[in-house]
Design a protein with these regions (language model features):
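Aromatic- and charge-enriched surface segment that lines or borders ligand/interaction sites
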Residues: 89-133, 147-153, 238-244, 293-296, ...
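Detector for C-terminal structural segments
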Residues: 29, 208, 213, 307-351, ...
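Gly/Pro-rich hinge or "lid" segments in bacterial periplasmic/extracellular proteins
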Residues: 56-57, 74-76, 168-222, 226, ...
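Local pocket/hinge segments that shape ligand/substrate recognition
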Residues: 254-403, 497-504, 538-555
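N-terminal lobe/hinge region of extracytoplasmic solute-binding protein
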Residues: 37-95, 194-195
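Surface-exposed binding/hinge segments that line
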Residues: 95-96, 101-103, 136-181, 556
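Extracellular/periplasmic solute-recognition and catalytic clefts
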Residues: 128, 134-137, 144-146, 202-212, ...
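Ligand/substrate-recognition segments at binding pockets and active sites
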Residues: 206, 336, 356-366, 370, ...
Length: 589
């Protein structure tokens, strides 16, 4: 995903989003049904609770079709012009950044015909005050939101200059009566969602969900007569559906997309990918490490990271659509290069080909070219494989470490480095990359295998509620125009809880970051670099790739899509931007 909108937004103490142009539609309905597929491999269940990460609305990324955010941030535009008023028409900071006062849009109705107002917003923030419902990592609130006339004031324990996207852009507003129930029971099933969004549920089946225009929508009539979101098992099946005209908009890695789709009819078939996050290898650092051995040590995690050939992942697993991550800081580069240390120590220090890091960076890190894995593990107290040798300066174990022959494996205290990579088979790119990681690390003396999840639901349920069920996994990042968004997730937010990672220094640096005026770079940059150093040395996550905002679409039915020449919004068919994009499209006559 791509979250680049915040850099220009966070340097101001107040911002009236009502001054920005409202981009909604006044179309007359009648356009043909638009078929959208945000992701593959989701097992449908009739649950549209936006605060249950296992609901079909969450799994498919369709929350904002019904339950809207307060502000729509154009994640490709870091200026105030990229801030679009939605259910809030304005906001401003107070109390040194600890309070955010929202002006709530008037004359809005829910899709059941009832009136929307400030009380619904306040009730929604009571939902995210429950840690079990706070799936997006909204910072801790000091007290309940207060309502005065047409305003709602949110009260936080710490300044929130860095958290606008999470607080205002990813909190999906519920009707107060529903919000009160979800606050008490965050995983309650919502079979028929009530919201203010442009669409409402038309019909549900285990293979297809249909959405119809909300006749009460405050933003005008949606241009589409219907939105269909089908259950598609694999990326290959999505490719077939695009080619046959059974799919108009896909948000996943389509194999050989140009050959298999775009080039068949370049006038209507399109693909545009923008790098907007850091894909990492999650390490299970919960007690027991899911049964893995070795990954509880930072030296082993660093060696794993340095041993991965990221170019192979980018070119083979991602078909060249995503770039190899080049910095162990996990910053999104080159977008965030200004935050890197001036000495160049964390620039291009990761292996992107042939298991060898950039020579200059390797020297700065005191890692001789071609000996990175060897030195890291040897210095960490691990004994090299008995069969190991150096071939043209590159360490090799002498054979694959597969657990059956410890002569090919690094050992320490009678243990070898042993773990599996757990990802959904329907995510063909991740699954291919899991296999590549196994193939790359076994010759380096680590017993690495793959473990399949049969679908997203199986995989996500294991990640969120069964820490003994996985050891490592490939996972996308939260993105962000500023480093804070991903770092918060990794060090203190949802991801940190899932992998079991705690670091007091990281928490302190995040607190300092959130309290710092973004224009005060003399204070800000050293603070961010503390987080970079923690990521680089402790390696709770190994950066792999710069994640693409998957976006493959057909203009045969509708025009007005975001593209490289008109990048008005993160283009992926997912929330929160999905509904915004749908309201900009124009039917082809």
């Amino acid at each position: 995903m791509n979250w680049r909108s915040l850099a220009g937004l966070l340097g101001v103490a107040a911002l009236a989003v009502g001054a920005c142009q409202q981009s909604t539609s006044n179309n007359t309905p009648g356009g043909r049904p638009l078929i959208a597929e945000p992701t593959t491999g989701v097992t449908f269940s009739q649950d549209f609770n936006p605060y249950d990460s296992n609901s079909v609305a969450s799994s498919m990324g369709t929350r904002s079709l019904v339950n809207e955010p307060l502000v729509e941030f154009d994640e490709l535009d870091p200026t105030s012009a990229g801030t679009h008023p939605w259910l809030a028409t304005a906001f401003q900071f107070g109390n040194s950044g600890k309070d955010i006062q929202l002006t709530i849009r008037q004359n809005v109705k829910f899709n059941d015909g009832s009136s929307f107002g400030p009380a619904d917003v306040a009730a929604t923030y009571k939902v995210v005050a429950n840690p079990k419902a706070n799936v997006f990592g909204v910072p801790d609130q000091a007290s309940d939101a207060t309502v005065s006339g047409n305003t709602v004031t949110l009260h936080f324990k710490t300044p929130q200059y860095t958290s606008l996207f999470t607080i205002l852009g990813k909190t999906y507003v519920l009707k107060a009566s529903v919000a009160n129930q979800v606050a008490a029971n965050p995983t309650m099933a919502i079979a028929n969602p009530v919201g203010t969004g442009p669409f409402m549920l038309a019909s549900y089946s285990s293979s297809l969900i249909k959405w119809k225009p909300n006749p009460n929508y405050w933003g005008g009539t949606p241009p589409e007569s219907e939105i269909d979101t089908p259950a598609i098992a694999t990326n290959a099946a999505a490719s077939d559906a695009l080619v046959s005209g059974q799919l108009d908009w896909a948000g996943n890695d389509i194999p050989n997309v140009y050959e298999n789709f775009v080039n068949l009819n370049p006038q209507t078939n399109h693909a545009w990918f923008a790098s907007g996050s850091t894909v990492t290898l999650y390490f299970n650092l919960n007690p027991g490490n899911g049964g893995a051995t070795g990954i509880n040590e930072s030296a082993v995690r660093k060696a794993i990271s340095y041993g991965i050939d990221r170019n192979a992942l980018a070119l083979l697993g991602e078909s060249g659509y995503e770039r190899a991550a080049s910095s162990s800081s996990a910053l999104i580069l080159p977008n965030q290069k200004a935050f890197l240390p001036s000495d160049g120590s964390l620039a291009n220090d990761l292996s992107t080909a042939s298991n060898v890091p950039d020579p200059a960076a390797a020297t700065a890190q005191k890692l001789p070219t071609g000996m990175d894995v060897y030195d890291i593990l040897k210095n960490g107290g691990w004994t090299p494989p008995a069969t190991s040798h150096f071939d043209s300066g590159t360490f090799k174990s002498g054979g694959n470490c597969d657990g059956s022959n410890t002569a090919n494996c690094w050992t320490k205290g009678g243990q070898i480095i042993k773990f599996s990579v757990y990802d959904p088979v329907p995510f063909s790119d991740y699954w291919e990359n899991a296999a590549l990681i196994s193939q790359e690390l076994q010759p380096l003396g680590m017993d690495v295998t793959t473990k399949p999840a049969q679908g997203y639901s199986d995989w996500n349920t294991t990640l969120t509620s069964n820490p003994a069920g996985w050891q490592t996994m490939i996972h996308w990042g939260n993105g962000g125009s500023i480093p804070y968004i991903q770092y918060y997730d990794w060090f203190q937010g949802t991801a940190a809880g899932q992998v079991g990672y705690k670091n007091a220094d990281a928490s302190a640096a995040l607190t300092a970051y959130a309290s710092t005026d973004p224009n005060d770079t003399a204070t800000l940059y050293p603070t961010v670099q503390k987080l970079e150093k923690i990521m680089s040395t402790d390696v709770p996550y190994a950066p792999l790739l710069y994640g693409a905002d998957w976006n493959v679409y057909s203009s045969a039915k509708y025009t007005g899509w975001p593209n490289q020449s008109h990048p008005y919004m993160n283009p992926s068919p997912s929330d929160p931007q999905m509904a915004y994009i749908l309201m900009q499209l124009k039917p082809v006559s």
